[in-house]
Design a protein with these regions (language model features):
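Catalytic-core region of carbohydrate-active enzymes that cleave or remodel glycosidic bonds
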Residues: 215-324, 328, 339
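An active-site-proximal structural segment forming one wall of the substrate-binding cleft
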Residues: 74-94, 117-154
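N-terminal carbohydrate-binding accessory modules
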Residues: 1-50, 83
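A cross-kingdom feature marking solvent-exposed beta-strand/loop segments within repeated
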Residues: 310, 329-332, 393, 411-415, ...
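Aromatic- and acidic-residue-enriched segments that line the glycan-binding/catalytic groove
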Residues: 65-73, 97-123, 173-177, 207-210, ...
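Active-site neighborhood of glycoside hydrolase catalytic domains
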Residues: 128-205
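Aromatic-lined ligand-binding clefts that engage carbohydrates, nucleic acids, or primary amines
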Residues: 414-430, 458, 530-553, 560-561, ...
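Aromatic-lined substrate-binding rim segments of carbohydrate-active enzymes
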Residues: 36-105, 177-182
Length: 605
């Protein structure tokens, strides 16, 4: 059927008939395609009529002008996801960036936008708008056939994301609408902002449906919807993001939201006549290096640690959602489903759905390889400069950079200080020997050592843990970013930089006769082969490993870290074969383990 969503004070109409909008966020790029159908079936069972999803610019155009709508294994196949939504009878609310936040690296903006001294985003800056225009031309061609006006499932398209909390340039939002319209988008546009009258004024434009975002507590729900009703009496009460949980951060305690409170808040919203979108309805995974970070105070019950600092997000994007990262419905799912059923006059249903099957395995790690022995095989660009270059200046988005310099032997003892220099984590080596690790905002002490008369080579393996996604610090650079790299209060010059994006491990030269004692505390790749039941999920336990990433059959599952709270990494069953599966682990400070366990459940906090 062909038609356009009609928006009136009393609600919505589609194809000339009343349409009840019940929606939730499910992000195609955070779920392996083999699991899309499971979560969409659960959405239908719940009673949703639409799915909302962001479109991540930073993943679809990692390199300027090079577009990717497939990813590692189909997780960026936007067309495939839209087709499946349509098949399931679900409409779609599409949020096509540019900025999406969503705890993504740089809020979904691609790193190639960064230019030192010119961090201008989310406005009508000519360079920025030109980049958006080129992206939209390609992106719109991808989803235009799926607009409801073309017989597809997309009934609404968002302009930006919570812009009212960042800027006040109405012309910018109008420009985005103009660009989308010029590329054929003719369904209604909408905006969402944190509930505040000024944010709504700054973040909305005439002719667009306006929504509020807020936490799922009864009191906040009532306040937000009362304010929205006063500010926008001509439209339905629309909740763009009903925050029913929150994201995890490495090294922080995690407090799930009370599912009964969320259900009560949902009931409050429905009884006030609101149309609610759950954020998140289904959790997911920040595959590879794609998670972002926050610079600010954490959401933690530990008051002693509640001060502003750098906080990288975990690989898991479970988000305390109604459907967990593992694809199973939670208590929150059933309680909120009860509320919707009651509101719509449906019969009460039992709280039971078959859980997804999972499997346990133990895998021997029979091969190993030193990162330093394989730099020529997997390293990227190598450059030597007086001052260190940032990751972005090396043309790199994610991963690691090895910085090396020579220290003269004129001092009997030496003190190394990295003042505001490391973004975000650095393993430190002297003549190849591990000496310690610096972390950004980690309260690190200076490292002291002796330099022989012949001098010594200093090496810093620096990792990007995710660019900040909060608006105030967009566009931060990564790597060694400051000249304040001092040895005995003297600046260090003449640096060799080796780019290590870890986007292809095929050329690594593994050895089966390795001695683990010689590899302890060094950056090491480990490899093992295993059998499994194809199509069945499992969860890799990272106990005994320090920090790094894991690949299964070439797919970068994501980052692990013994800082916690996340203790497992999800492996979608769609990645597994019955035989010949390969696991590869990169550990920045190898601890000596030669086997790894796969569990039947997710351990997130």
């Amino acid at each position: 059927m062909y038609g356009k969503l009609e928006i009136g004070k009393s609600g919505f109409k589609l194809y000339g008939e009343k349409f009840y909008l019940a929606s939730g966020d499910i992000h195609y790029f955070r779920i392996h395609p083999s699991s899309w159908e499971n979560v969409l079936d659960l959405a239908v069972d719940f009673g949703l009529t639409a799915i909302q999803t962001y479109v991540p610019w930073h993943l679809h155009e990692k390199k300027q002008g090079h577009f990717d709508f497939w990813g590692q294994d189909g997780e960026l196949n936007l067309k495939g996801f839209l087709e499946l939504c349509d098949k399931k009878g679900l409409k779609v609310l599409l949020r096509p960036s540019p900025y999406i936040c969503s705890e993504c690296d740089m809020g979904g903006l691609p790193a190639w936008l960064i230019k030192r001294g010119r961090e201008i985003y989310r406005c009508c800056d000519a360079d920025y708008i030109n980049a958006v225009e080129n992206y939209y031309k390609r992106l719109c061609a991808e989803f235009l056939p799926f607009l409801s006006t073309n017989g597809g499932p997309i009934i609404g398209v968002a302009l930006e994301n919570e812009y009212g909390g960042y800027g006040n340039e109405e012309g910018y939002l109008l420009k985005l609408r103009e660009l989308l319209s010029e590329n054929g988008v003719d369904v209604p546009f909408y905006t969402t902002d944190t509930f505040d009258s000024l944010m709504l004024v700054n973040g909305s434009v005439d002719g667009c449906l306006c929504g509020f975002n807020f936490r799922s507590t009864p009191s906040e729900t009532e306040k937000a919807l009362e304010l929205l009703g006063k500010l926008k009496p001509e439209q339905p009460l629309f909740v763009g993001d009903f925050w029913c949980g929150r994201s995890q951060m490495w090294g922080e305690k995690y407090s799930p939201r009370d599912p009964r409170e969320t259900a009560e808040a949902y009931k409050t919203a429905l009884n006030m006549g609101a149309y609610v979108n759950f954020y998140m309805f289904a959790g997911g995974t920040n595959f590879g290096f794609t998670s972002g970070s926050l610079y600010g105070a954490p959401f933690t019950p530990d008051k002693e640690k509640n001060y502003p600092r750098f906080l990288p997000y975990t690989t898991s994007y479970d988000g305390d959602a109604l459907i967990g990262e593992d694809g199973n419905p939670t208590e929150k799912y059933f309680l909120c489903r009860d509320i919707l059923d009651e509101y719509l006059g449906k019969a009460k249903r039992p709280h039971f759905i078959d859980r997804k099957k999972s499997q346990e395995l133990t895998v021997k790690l029979t091969e190993a390889a030193s990162l330093f022995d394989n730099l020529e095989n997997i390293g990227g660009e190598v450059r030597t400069t007086v001052l260190p270059l940032s990751m972005e200046e090396l043309g790199q988005e994610f991963g690691y950079v090895l910085y090396e310099t020579r220290l003269n032997g004129s001092e009997s003892w030496t003190r190394l200080r990295l003042v505001n220099s490391v973004r975000d984590r650095a393993s430190i080596y002297l003549n190849g020997e591990y000496k310690g690790t610096y972390t950004r905002d980690g309260g690190n002490e200076p490292i002291e050592f002796t330099v022989p008369k012949s001098g010594i080579k200093l090496g810093l393996l620096v990792e990007n843990l995710g660019r900040c996604c909060n608006a105030a610090v967009l566009g931060e650079i990564k790597g060694l970013v400051s000249p304040e790299i001092t040895v005995n209060l003297k600046n260090s010059f003449n640096w060799k930089q080796t780019s290590i994006p870890l986007n292809n491990l095929n050329a690594i030269e593994y050895k089966s006769n390795f001695r683990k004692e010689k590899l302890l505390n060094y950056p090491v790749f480990l490899k093992g082969e295993f059998e499994a039941e194809a199509g069945i999920d499992t969860f890799i336990s990272t106990e005994g490993f320090t920090h790094g990433n894991i690949w299964v059959n070439g797919f970068n599952i994501g980052r692990y870290w013994n800082a916690g709270p996340q203790k497992t990494l999800l492996v979608s069953g769609g990645l597994l074969k019955d035989k010949g599966n390969i696991i590869e682990i990169f550990d920045t400070e190898y601890g000596g383990k030669t086997e790894i366990k796969f569990l039947s459940k997710n351990l997130l906090y």
